[in-house]
């Protein structure tokens, strides 16, 4: 299956807000669908920078950089976005977009170890040049910690019995082995959902530190945005969406009075204005079922107070 970018036009249009030039960042290049559309809307003076840590994504990005001198790829996690941009002399940008989660090619390639639908080595690393594989991590993690991770990151109600079964199995080498253990341990299957779905999601999030990276990325992204610059982020599950929602809420709400019952003037620390929250259309969901769970949240950088 080729990768189909989710909420493609909605994301790029929300990012540009009718602009045709400027400096932009795609924080999750993937296979470049959003970046290519963005470049097609921009004039010759614009610049687009993209981040990714997946070696296969970097190959696609390197080819695009050869085709289009306005584009630069940076081999790094978006959690390092501010530091990496400052290293190349970019202090502020007009827009930042991110498409979170695993891309279709990663899921479809058995050797990447993300999918329970195809047998492959139990890997799951976004950047397979460093860090523990899922197989190595499962050997090291304590049963109680594993149960908590499956519960928190997979929102799996049977996390304890699944964690117990995984740890009792000992060394696991393939995705099929893990999927079968989870399937056997799971007492109640959800309609239209493989019983290993939530557990695989939880392990992937844990070994790639996905939620940690999002929490680090969001405030840095706002730091980089110019006034009226846009932040457009696509999430695919409730954990990601909750983080983004809470962050935008916090950055767009007046701080509560903490005057211990005494009158105190509120300080306006708001940095963002909510713009929109968008779901994929029925037509897009039919064409690309993966888009069913996707949410796009858009916010705009406010003018700096006292500037």
UniProtKB/Swiss-Prot annotation:
Transmembrane segments: none
SUPFAM superfamilies (alphabetical): Putative methyltransferase TM0872, insert domain, S-adenosyl-L-methionine-dependent methyltransferases
The protein's name in its UniProt record: Ribosomal RNA small subunit methyltransferase H
Enzyme class at the top of the EC tree: transferase
Pfam families: Methyltransf_5
Reaction equations catalysed: cytidine(1402) in 16S rRNA + S-adenosyl-L-methionine = N(4)-methylcytidine(1402) in 16S rRNA + S-adenosyl-L-homocysteine + H(+)
GO cellular component, one term: cytoplasm
UniProt binding sites for S-adenosyl-L-methionine: 32-34, 52, 78, 99, 106
Gene: rsmH
Keywords on record: Cytoplasm, Methyltransferase, rRNA processing, S-adenosyl-L-methionine, Transferase
Function, in words: Specifically methylates the N4 position of cytidine in position 1402 (C1402) of 16S rRNA.
Gene3D superfamilies: Putative methyltransferase TM0872, insert domain, Vaccinia Virus protein VP39
GO terms of molecular function: rRNA (cytosine-N4-)-methyltransferase activity
Family: Belongs to the methyltransferase superfamily. RsmH family.
EC number(s) recorded for this UniProt protein: 2.1.1.199
Example GO BP: rRNA base methylation
Keyword set includes Methyltransferase: yes
Main location: cytoplasm
Keyword Methyltransferase: yes
Subcellular location, record wording: Cytoplasm
InterPro entries in UniProt: RsmH (IPR002903), SAM-dep_MeTrfase_MraW_recog (IPR023397), SAM-dependent_MTases_sf (IPR029063)
């Amino acid at each position: 299956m080729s990768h189909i970018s989710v909420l493609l036009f909605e994301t790029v249009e929300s990012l540009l807000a009718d602009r045709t030039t400027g400096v932009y960042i795609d924080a999750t290049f993937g296979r470049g669908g959003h970046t290519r559309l963005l470049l097609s809307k921009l004039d010759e003076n614009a610049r687009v920078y993209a981040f990714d840590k997946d070696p296969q994504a970097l190959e696609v990005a390197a080819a695009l950089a050869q085709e289009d001198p306005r584009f630069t790829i940076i081999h790094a996690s978006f959690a390092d976005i501010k530091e990496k941009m400052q290293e190349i002399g970019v202090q502020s940008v007009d827009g930042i977009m991110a498409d979170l989660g695993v891309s279709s090619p990663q899921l479809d390639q058995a050797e990447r170890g993300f999918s329970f639908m195809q047998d492959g080595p139990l890997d799951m690393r976004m950047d397979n040049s460093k860090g523990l594989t899922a197989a190595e991590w499962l050997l090291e993690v304590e049963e109680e910690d594993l149960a908590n991770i499956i519960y928190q990151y997979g929102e799996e109600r049977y996390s304890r019995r699944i964690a117990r079964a995984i740890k009792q199995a000992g060394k696991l080498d393939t995705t099929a082995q893990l999927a079968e253990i989870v399937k056997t341990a799971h007492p109640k299957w959800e309609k239209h959902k493989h019983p290993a779905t939530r557990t695989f999601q939880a392990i992937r999030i844990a070994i790639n530190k996905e939620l940690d990276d999002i929490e680090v990325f969001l405030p840095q992204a706002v730091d980089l945005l110019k006034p009226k610059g846009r932040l457009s982020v696509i999430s695919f599950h409730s954990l990601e969406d909750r983080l983004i929602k809470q962050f935008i809420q916090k950055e767009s709400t007046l701080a509560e009075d903490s005057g211990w019952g005494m009158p105190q003037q509120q300080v306006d620390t708001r940095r963002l204005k909510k713009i929109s929250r968008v779901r994929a259309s029925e037509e897009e969901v039919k064409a690309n079922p993966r888009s069913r769970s996707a949410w796009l949240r858009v916010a705009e950088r406010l003018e700096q107070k006292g500037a």
